[in-house]
């Protein structure tokens, strides 16, 4: 009985073993794919975290951070000038110290330095004036410009249309000499250049018109008038200086000038002892003509002198705003043949 039991037990065990042997193994292919995808995803996450926190910086959360950044940037620029104080005396002392530093570093003594000739400057000015004359004479541009100005000008009722009869823009050039740097006489301590100017040339403008007598009825009488004005000589002392347009002494009267912001401007004026000579020729009448009437010459001469004195003679002055001198790509030029020359040299 025991043997049978053993045999039976052995048979059962064999069956169990056989069943265990023939049980199909589970498929692990899907588990491997999941592991591979999870591994790649984890690598991508680690790379993103590294790039975010170690490569890119965070954006400033508020305007306060931007202000602090500006303060940090301001510390990068080396400022060698002394700090300005709030009072006027401190500002004046700072400007005086700045001018003294400029004179010291340029080795210029305003009290003992000899006047300088401006031969090189005369050449540059002559080239500029020559170019302007060529442009003015090109296609009679100066005639059309003056004629358009006269046609659009408001004339009094007793004057007929003005017609141009003669234009002469000269062929000589001004001579600048005896340049010296001095402190301004107004007590501000500003540096200014005193330059002697001399021009001996003939600049002529001739016109003709008619004086209309409209009383007691329109066009009761007509008086033809021909007038030719020539400037033959000018000499004087030119004062030139650089000013800041934000200064109260140089603030413009128009809103457009004030809204354009601050900057550097060129201020110039002429001394009251200038010399200006005119030659005025007149011809009045139709049948019986009066030539070179002294009263007309004196009137024209006085009007031209007053016009010049009211604009350019001390204490009046002219202020011309200077453009920005900072190099810009839009202002960059090169010779026309430069590119072709480089290509030829490269091919060789």
From Swiss-Prot:
* GO MF term set: lipid binding
Q: Which residues lie on this side of the membrane: Lumenal?
A: 1-35
Q: What is its main location?
A: endoplasmic reticulum
Q: Name one GO cellular component term.
A: ERMES complex
- What's a GO biological-process term for it? phospholipid transport
* InterPro entries attached to this UniProt entry: Mmm1 (IPR027537), MMM1_dom (IPR019411), SMP_LBD (IPR031468)
According to the UniProt entry, the coiled-coil residues are none
Chain ranges passing through the membrane: 36-56
Where can this protein be found? Endoplasmic reticulum membrane
Outline the segment boundaries, as ranges, of region: Disordered: 328-348
Q: How does it assemble?
A: Homodimer. Component of the ER-mitochondria encounter structure (ERMES) or MDM complex, composed of MMM1, MDM10, MDM12 and MDM34. A MMM1 homodimer associates with one molecule of MDM12 on each side in a pairwise head-to-tail manner, and the SMP-LTD domains of MMM1 and MDM12 generate a continuous hydrophobic tunnel for phospholipid trafficking.
- The protein's role, per its UniProt record: Component of the ERMES/MDM complex, which serves as a molecular tether to connect the endoplasmic reticulum (ER) and mitochondria. Components of this complex are involved in the control of mitochondrial shape and protein biogenesis, and function in nonvesicular lipid trafficking between the ER and mitochondria. The MDM12-MMM1 subcomplex functions in the major beta-barrel assembly pathway that is responsible for biogenesis of all outer membrane beta-barrel proteins, and acts in a late step after the SAM complex.
Q: What is the designated name of this protein?
A: Maintenance of mitochondrial morphology protein 1
């Amino acid at each position: 009985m025991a043997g049978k039991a053993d045999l039976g037990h052995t048979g059962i065990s064999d069956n169990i073993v056989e069943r265990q042997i023939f049980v199909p193994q589970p498929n692990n292919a899907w588990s491997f794919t999941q592991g591979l995808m999870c591994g790649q995803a984890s690598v991508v996450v680690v790379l993103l975290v590294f790039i975010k926190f170690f490569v890119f910086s965070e954006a400033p959360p508020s305007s306060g951070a931007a202000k602090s950044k500006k303060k940090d940037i301001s510390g990068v620029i080396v400022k060698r000038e002394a700090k300005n104080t709030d009072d006027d005396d401190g500002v004046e002392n700072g400007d005086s110290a700045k001018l003294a530093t400029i004179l010291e570093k340029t080795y210029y003594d305003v009290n003992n330095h000899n006047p300088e000739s401006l031969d090189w400057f005369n050449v540059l000015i002559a080239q500029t004036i020559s170019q302007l004359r060529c442009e003015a004479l090109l296609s009679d541009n100066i005639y059309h410009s003056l004629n358009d100005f006269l046609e659009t000008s408001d004339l009094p009722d007793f004057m007929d249309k003005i017609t141009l009869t003669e234009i002469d823009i000269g062929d000589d050039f001004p001579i600048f000499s005896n340049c010296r740097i001095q402190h301004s006489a107004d007590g501000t301590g500003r540096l200014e250049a005193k330059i002697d100017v001399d021009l001996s040339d003939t600049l002529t403008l001739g016109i003709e018109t008619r004086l209309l007598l409209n009383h007691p009825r329109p066009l009761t009488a007509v008086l033809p008038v021909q007038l030719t004005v020539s400037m033959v000589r000018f000499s004087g002392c030119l004062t030139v200086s650089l000013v800041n347009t934000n200064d109260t002494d140089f603030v413009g009267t128009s809103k457009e000038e004030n809204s354009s912001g601050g900057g550097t401007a060129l201020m110039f004026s002429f001394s009251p002892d200038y010399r200006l000579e005119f030659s005025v020729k007149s011809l009045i009448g139709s049948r019986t003509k009066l030539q070179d009437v002294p009263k007309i010459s004196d009137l024209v001469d006085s009007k031209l002198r007053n016009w010049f004195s009211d604009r350019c003679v001390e204490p009046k002055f002219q202020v011309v705003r200077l453009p920005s001198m900072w190099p810009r790509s839009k202002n960059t030029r090169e010779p026309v043949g430069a590119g072709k020359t480089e290509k030829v040299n490269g091919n060789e």
